[in-house]
Amino acid sequence: MALGLKCFRMVHPTFRNYLAASIRPVSEVTLKTVHERQHGHRQYMAYSAVPVRHFATKKAKAKGKGQSQTRVNINAALVEDIINLEEVNEEMKSVIEALKDNFNKTLNIRTSPGSLDKIAVVTADGKLALNQISQISMKSPQLILVNMASFPECTAAAIKAIRESGMNLNPEVEGTLIRVPIPQVTREHREMLVKLAKQNTNKAKDSLRKVRTNSMNKLKKSKDTVSEDTIRLIEKQISQMADDTVAELDRHLAVKTKELLG
């Protein structure tokens, strides 16, 4: 207790007054910067309010068993010279948006011309979207036409890309015109789309892991100039952001699965 009071007195008066006036649960951690030079290390001290124990009900205890209930909320501006957390957050959000876009454009019960637009076709100039090298139109509710007259040399590659798109399509070719019959909506077709949705979600999680790994690697580059406690706190923030993003990806998958299965 005496040691605690001594440490409390050592805190800058501004922070001490703030702490005395603002008693909050220890779970609400705010990063405050105190610029000190100790052995060449910058110290980013994390000050939390006086700990208050919250007595949970049995139900709440059971729900939280085995899970860490402490969350951090670092002010990105205070650590921007170490890592740009706002940029990391935007990269994680882009993973979610890419999955949502994929779901909306390629995973629909009824195949539409728009579903074929972004199919990647391997050409001599690299991968191009199908709508960049063709004209796609709906001839009837049961048939989509893909006109390859502008890039006839890419016809075979376009057929291959459509067939391997995972949308259960079997294109037929007549010269430079590709006919794409729209499959009937069967239970098997619905389940196939759900399987594809899960695969795309797993790919999104792979992309998210890359964002997290790259962020952690950037953070480690500062270990010689920033305290270990600060590094660990920022690592926890990044992991927390990644976990929240995974939960969001799973939520979108659940919604899409329900939509596809009817």
UniProtKB/Swiss-Prot annotation:
Keyword Protein biosynthesis: yes
Predominant location category: mitochondrion
Pfam families, sorted: RRF
Molecular function terms, GO-annotated: ribosomal large subunit binding
One Gene Ontology CC term in the entry: mitochondrion
GO biological process: ribosome disassembly; translation
Transit peptide extent on chain: 1-55
InterPro entries: Ribosome_recyc_fac, Ribosome_recyc_fac_dom, RRF_sf
Family: Belongs to the RRF family.
Primary role: Responsible for the disassembly of ribosomes from messenger RNA at the termination of mitochondrial protein biosynthesis. Acts in collaboration with GFM2. Promotes mitochondrial ribosome recycling by dissolution of intersubunit contacts.
Name by which UniProt lists this protein: Ribosome-recycling factor, mitochondrial
Native organism: Homo sapiens
Upper lineage: Eukaryota, Metazoa, Chordata, Craniata, Vertebrata
